[in-house]
Amino acid sequence: KVLELYSRPDNPLFIPETIGHGPLTRFFFAALGRGAIGYAPFGMDDTAIQRGRDGRPLVADEKYGDTALNYRLLEPMAREIARLNHAGKVQTAVQLAVDSTSGPGSTFDRVHYLTDQTLHFEGWDADIAFGRFNRLARITRQPEGPDGRILIAELGKGEFLLAGYHCRVLFRPTAEKKERPWQYLQVEEGRYVDGEFRASRILNGDQTDWGLVFATPTVLRVQLYTR
């Protein structure tokens, strides 16, 4: 709600200070979805020894790993994200709470497909469910706190760039093609290098048919078509 209040056409959104550890770091994605031009986690330059609840000193990954996850995922394509965001092509979603009551859901029941949020693009909707998933359903063991996040950028007609963690995404056609059969033309996992997307592997049907699962921080380039 705070991001909504401060993100206006006459007021570019800038987050001057925010928590840099724990599940709240997922709201970096929410800020990007509101067109933020800056985001500054507090205490990243603090070199003092910090101790955990058991009294032992925390290592760097325990102190900064949550913020590092965001930057490691998006830094290689920061310029591309900024350009796409300026053009109004970027949308994001973050997990607001861990839902322990909904059950695993069924990928075979597309009428009641497990969905927490839906993002709307030209000709396509992206249904998003947060948490840990296997190929077919949400698994029993979930993170203690909500940490799911997804960024989807529209690259062209039926072509999208996705970056996310602990979520599942299923596209479906809308408008006049709502009832048409559709398919993934290609789903590539990779990263940006010097402004170009370089695929490290192409996902097969078993890895895409029931939704795109982001079990680890992952970047995908997706091409869709309708018959």
Go through each PLM region and give its residues.
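Aromatic- and carboxylate-lined catalytic core of secreted/periplasmic carbohydrate-active enzymes
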Residues: 29-167
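Glycoside hydrolase catalytic-domain groove-lining segments
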Residues: 1-28
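A generic structural motif
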Residues: 14-22, 39-48, 184-197, 201-202
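Flexible loop/turn segments at secondary-structure boundaries
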Residues: 2, 21-24, 47-50, 169-170
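C-terminal beta-sandwich/jelly-roll accessory domains of carbohydrate-active enzymes
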Residues: 119-227
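Aromatic-residue detector
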Residues: 6, 27, 31, 50, ...
